[in-house]
C-alpha cells in the first residue's frame, strides 16, 4: 500500500485525503494547529451571558463541486441553503436597491431600467455558462488545464476573452454601464488586489461562479460553514485517515522521501511515496530545500471582515421582504475609481480605500434552516484595506 502524506487539514487537504484513502492509499495528514479546518473554522463570543458561535474565516459556501459534496459523504451530514431571492445592490447616496435577479431576462430589464444598461446581458450569462461548464468538466475529470484544451473546447474567441483576457476587456465587451461592470467585475479583487487590466483576470469571474453545490450560487451551512470541515474530519477518521495535530514540520527530504516533524513526544519521521501540500503557497517554499529561493510571497491581503450581532431580527429599510438576500454596497461609481482604490491599497498609501461591502445575512439564513440562535448575525466583507498591514496595525 502506497503512503501519502498531506500537509494541511483545510478543506482541500481533507477532500484529497477522503478520495485517496478510498482509493486504497495509506493517508496521513500533518497539521500544525490543534484542530482541523483551515479557514473553515469557528470562533465563539459570549454576549449578555449567552454563547454564540460564528465563522472565524470563510462564511459562505459556493465553490465546492456537487460531486465532491456527494461523494465525500458530506451530503448526508450537511444541511445547506442558498437564497432564491434577488441579490440587492446599492450605490452611494441611494436608498433603493437594484435587484440582481437569477433569471437573466428579468435581470436585463432591471439593469436597463435602473442603470441604463444597453449591453448584452443574456449573451454574457450564456457565454459565462459555457466557460463554467468547461471548468466543471476539468474538475470532474481531473484534467490539468492548458491553453490547447481551452481553445479546443471553447474556441479561440471565448478563450481569449474569458480565460486569457483582462477583466476590463471582458466587461467592456458585454456591458455599457459602469455600474453593471462594477457589479459583474467585483469578484476580480475579492481574493487580492489584482488589476482589471492584467491578463487572466477575466477568468476570475466565471471561476467564482463555477461551484455546483448550490447551482453556481453562494449560500449557507446550517449552524455554520465549519460543519463542513468538522464532518469531513470525522468521516475521514472513520475511513482510516491518520491526522497528526500540533505538528511542526522541521524538514522535508525529497531524496529519501522523508518528512520530519515535531509533536509533544518528540520528533517523528514519516516516509511517503507522494507528498501533497494542501496549504498556502509559502509553506512548501519554506520546507523543501532549494524549492525556489527567489519566490517572495506575502501573508497579508486587502480584505476585511466584521461579524455584527443584534438582539432582534434585523429589519431593513429597503426590501425587507428579502431578509435572506445578499446585499452589496459600492463606494465607487466607475471602473476607474474601482481600480484606483484597489491599486492604492496595494501601494500602501493609506489604511483604507473604500471599494465595496458584501453583506451576508447569516442569522436570517440560519432561521430559514430552522436553526434558532440567541442573536441575529450579519457578516460584512469589505475591500480595500492596506496590503502590508494586519488588522491590529490599522488606524482605527
What is each residue range found by the language model?
Residues 153, 186, 211-220, 303, ...:
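Glycine- and acidic
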Residues 250-371:
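Mid-domain catalytic core of redox enzymes
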Residues 23, 170-174, 231, 235, ...:
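Generic, well-ordered alpha-helical scaffold segments in large soluble proteins
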Residues 207-251, 255:
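Helical element adjacent to the flavin cofactor pocket in flavoenzyme catalytic cores
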Residues 94-199:
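Rossmann-like flavin
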Amino acid at each position: 500500500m502506497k503512503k501519502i502524506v498531506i500537509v494541511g487539514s483545510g478543506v482541500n487537504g481533507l477532500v484529497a485525503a477522503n478520495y485517496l484513502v478510498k482509493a486504497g492509499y495509506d493517508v496521513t495528514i500533518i497539521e500544525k494547529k490543534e484542530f482541523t479546518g483551515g479557514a473553515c473554522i469557528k470562533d465563539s463570543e459570549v454576549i449578555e451571558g449567552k454563547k454564540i458561535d460564528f465563522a472565524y474565516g470563510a462564511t459562505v459556501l459556493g465553490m465546492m463541486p456537487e460531486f465532491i459534496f456527494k461523494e465525500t459523504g458530506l451530503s448526508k451530514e450537511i444541511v445547506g441553503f442558498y437564497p432564491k431571492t434577488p441579490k440587492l445592490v446599492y450605490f452611494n447616496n441611494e436608498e433603493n436597491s437594484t435587484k440582481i435577479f437569477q433569471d437573466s431576462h428579468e435581470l436585463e430589464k432591471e439593469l436597463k431600467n435602473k442603470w441604463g444598461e444597453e449591453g448584452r446581458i443574456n449573451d454574457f450569462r450564456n457565454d459565462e455558462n459555457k466557460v463554467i461548464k468547461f471548468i466543471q468538466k476539468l474538475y470532474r475529470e481531473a484534467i490539468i488545464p492548458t491553453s490547447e484544451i481551452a481553445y479546443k473546447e471553447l474556441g479561440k474567441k471565448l478563450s481569449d476573452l474569458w480565460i486569457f483576457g483582462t477583466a476590463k476587456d471582458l466587461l467592456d465587451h458585454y456591458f455599457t454601464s459602469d455600474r453593471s461592470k462594477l457589479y459583474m467585475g467585483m469578484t476580480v479583487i475579492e481574493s487580492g488586489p489584482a488589476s482589471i487590466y492584467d491578463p487572466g483576470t477575466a477568468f476570475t469571474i466565471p471561476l467564482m461562479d463555477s461551484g455546483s453545490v448550490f447551482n453556481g450560487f453562494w449560500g449557507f451551512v446550517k449552524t455554520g460553514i465549519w460543519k463542513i470541515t468538522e464532518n469531513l474530519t470525522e468521516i475521514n477518521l472513520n475511513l482510516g485517515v491518520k491526522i497528526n495535530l500540533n505538528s511542526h514540520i522541521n524538514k522535508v527530504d525529497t531524496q529519501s522521501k522523508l518528512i520530519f516533524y515535531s509533536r509533544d513526544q518528540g520528533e517523528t519521521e514519516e516516509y511517503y511515496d507522494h507528498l501533497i501540500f494542501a496549504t498556502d503557497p509559502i509553506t512548501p517554499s519554506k520546507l523543501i530545500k532549494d524549492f525556489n529561493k527567489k519566490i517572495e510571497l506575502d501573508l497579508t491581503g486587502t480584505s476585511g471582515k466584521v461579524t455584527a450581532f443584534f438582539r432582534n431580527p434585523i429589519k431593513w429599510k429597503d426590501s425587507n421582504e428579502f431578509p435572506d438576500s445578499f446585499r452589496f454596497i459600492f463606494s465607487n461609481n466607475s471602473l476607474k475609481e474601482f481600480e484606483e482604490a484597489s491599486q492604492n491599497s496595494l501601494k500602501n498609501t493609506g489604511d483604507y480605500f473604500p471599494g465595496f461591502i458584501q453583506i451576508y445575512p447569516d442569522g436570517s439564513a440560519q432561521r430559514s434552516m430552522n436553526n434558532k440562535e440567541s442573536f441575529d448575525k450579519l457578516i460584512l466583507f469589505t475591500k480595500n484595506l492596506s496590503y502590508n498591514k494586519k488588522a491590529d496595525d490599522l488606524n482605527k
